[in-house]
C-alpha cells in the first residue's frame, strides 16, 4: 500500500507498461477475446483500501475483499453489483499489511506480505475454509510463515500452483519484480523463500490465477499482463518464460486488486480509493 498516494508511481509504471507491451517477443494471442469496455458498478458503501479480491465459490455473485494495513482483520463480502453485504471478523490474526488474496479449492488465502519500509523479519500467509452465508466469524485459521534468504522485501502479489501447491511471491519495488518460491509441503514453523526468477517489469501489485490454473494475470498500476499455460507447464515455468500479452484495463485511482471470475467468464478489478471521490468495481467479460 502507498499511504501517501504518490501519483508519479502510477505514471511511471504506466509508461513502463506501454514499453513492455510494445515488444512482439512478449506477446501472445488470447484464445477468447476480452471486452475492452468493462462493466462498472459503484461500490456502496465505499471500501477505502481494497488490496485483494477473490470471486466466491460458496456464494456465487459475490466477491471476497480484504483491506491492507491499518484496517481490521476482516473479510468484506461484496456482491457483483457493488453493494457491501457484510463484514466477517477473522479471529487470532493481525492485519500488518495484507496485500493479496487467492481462493484455491475450498481454501481462502490472505497474504500478509507487504513491507513498504522493508524492515520485517518474517511474513505470513493465512488460510482457512471459504466462509458460507451462515459464517459470522472466521476462527479456525492456519498460517504459513516465511522469510527471504537476503533480508526484507515488499511484495503485493502471490500465486498458488493448484498442482504442486507451491506459492510464488512477486515483489513490488525492485528494479524488476522478482519471483520467490515457497515449496510445498510447508514447514509448520518457518519457511525460506527461494529466488527463482524476475519479470520484465516492476510495480506488481496483484496477481490472479484462472479457475482451471491455465491462465494467470499479473497486475501493475498501469497494466494487466496475461500469461497462458502451454502443454503441461507448471505455473512457475509459464510465468517466468512467458510470453505474455497486455489485457484491456481501465486505469484506476490506485488499482491493487485483480481476480478471475469463478466461472472463468472474465476478470474483476477493484481499486483503493486513493484521491478519488468514489470506488468502482470493474468486470471485463470474455466475448
Place the predicted regions along the sequence by residue.
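Sequence/structural signature of beta-propeller domains
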Residues: 22-287
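Bacterial Sec-dependent N-terminal signal peptides
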Residues: 1-34
Amino acid at each position: 500500500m502507498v499511504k501517501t498516494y504518490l501519483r508519479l508511481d502510477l505514471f511511471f509504471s504506466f509508461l513502463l507498461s506501454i514499453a513492455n507491451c510494445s515488444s512482439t517477443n512478449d506477446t501472445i494471442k488470447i484464445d477468447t477475446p476480452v471486452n475492452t469496455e468493462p462493466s462498472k458498478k459503484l461500490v456502496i458503501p465505499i471500501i477505502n483500501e481494497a488490496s485483494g479480491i477473490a470471486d466466491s465459490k460458496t456464494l456465487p455473485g459475490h466477491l471476497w475483499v480484504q483491506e491492507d494495513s491499518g484496517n481490521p482483520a476482516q473479510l468484506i463480502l461484496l456482491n457483483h453489483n457493488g453493494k457491501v453485504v457484510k463484514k466477517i471478523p477473522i479471529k487470532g490474526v493481525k492485519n500488518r499489511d495484507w496485500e493479496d488474496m487467492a481462493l484455491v479449492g475450498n481454501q481462502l488465502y490472505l497474504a500478509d506480505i507487504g513491507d513498504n519500509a522493508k524492515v520485517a523479519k518474517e511474513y505470513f500467509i493465512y488460510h482457512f475454509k471459504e466462509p458460507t452465508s451462515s459464517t459470522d466469524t472466521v476462527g479456525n485459521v492456519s498460517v504459513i510463515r516465511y522469510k527471504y534468504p537476503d533480508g526484507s522485501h515488499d511484495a503485493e502479489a502471490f500465486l498458488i500452483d493448484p498442482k504442486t501447491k507451491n506459492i510464488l511471491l512477486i515483489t513490488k519495488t525492485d528494479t524488476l519484480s522478482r519471483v520467490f518460491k515457497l515449496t510445498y509441503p510447508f514447514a509448520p514453523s518457518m519457511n525460506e523463500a527461494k529466488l527463482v526468477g524476475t519479470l520484465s517489469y516492476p510495480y506488481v501489485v496483484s496477481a490472479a490465477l484462472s479457475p482451471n490454473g491455465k491462465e494467470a494475470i499479473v497486475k501493475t498500476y498501469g497494466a494487466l499482463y496475461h500469461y497462458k499455460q502451454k502443454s503441461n507447464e507448471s505455473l512457475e515455468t509459464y510465468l517466468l518464460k512467458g510470453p505474455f500479452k497486455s489485457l484491456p484495463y481501465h486505469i484506476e485511482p490506485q488499482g491493487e486488486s485483480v481476480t478471475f471470475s469463478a466461472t472463468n467468464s472474465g476478470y474483476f478489478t477493484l481499486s483503493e480509493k486513493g484521491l478519488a471521490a468514489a470506488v468502482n468495481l470493474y468486470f471485463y467479460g470474455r466475448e
